[in-house]
Amino acid sequence: MTGDRCVVCGTSTHRPADACARCRRILDRVETRRDASGGLRRVDAAARLRALAGSWRDGAFRCYYTGVCLIEDHSRWRDHRYLVFEDRIPGDGASVVVTCALVSRMKADLTEDQFKLIVTELAKVFNGGTFDQGAFPDQPHAGTTRRPPA
């Protein structure tokens, strides 16, 4: 608790609040993603706080992967630049970073290294090259039976 400054962005706040209203709204978002077995994912609140604070640069939240300025207004949740939390290691809430919705959807259940490899191979195709199919990761969820959402 800092008393009069937001621990994320440094904006003035009131005692005993640790985060300003804007940052608190982001930190308190309800997790709707599900794990491989269909259960709701657990949120690592401390990791999310670190990720959000780490993404704050030059007066804005920035995407971990692209550095672009993110949109935090919930009414614009369908925008590709909307701020979301993303696990660098799928299912590991402690590895969470702040990213844009588009990158999060593209990365989905890939690790950071797998994502970089796929994007690099895709760029080769865009430049007239050939995609190396060896870049596809093994199927991490093969044999996993998903429960339908409750």
What are these regions (language model features)?
Residues 21-27, 77-91, 114-122:
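Short cysteine/histidine-rich metal-coordination sites, predominantly Zn2+-binding motifs
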Residues 2-7, 38-53, 80-87:
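Short Cys/His-rich Zn2+-coordinating modules
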Residues 2-5, 16, 55-61, 93-96:
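Short metal-coordination and nucleic-acid-contact micro-motifs, chiefly zinc-binding Cys/His arrays
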Residues 1-29:
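BZIP DNA-binding basic region
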Residues 26-62:
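Short, charged surface segments at domain edges that flank catalytic/cofactor-binding sites
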Residues 14-19, 73-76, 108-112:
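Short Cys/His-rich "knuckle" micro-motifs
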Residues 93-150:
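A detector for short metal-coordination/catalytic motifs
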Residues 48-50, 61-102, 107:
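Histidine-centered nuclease catalytic patch
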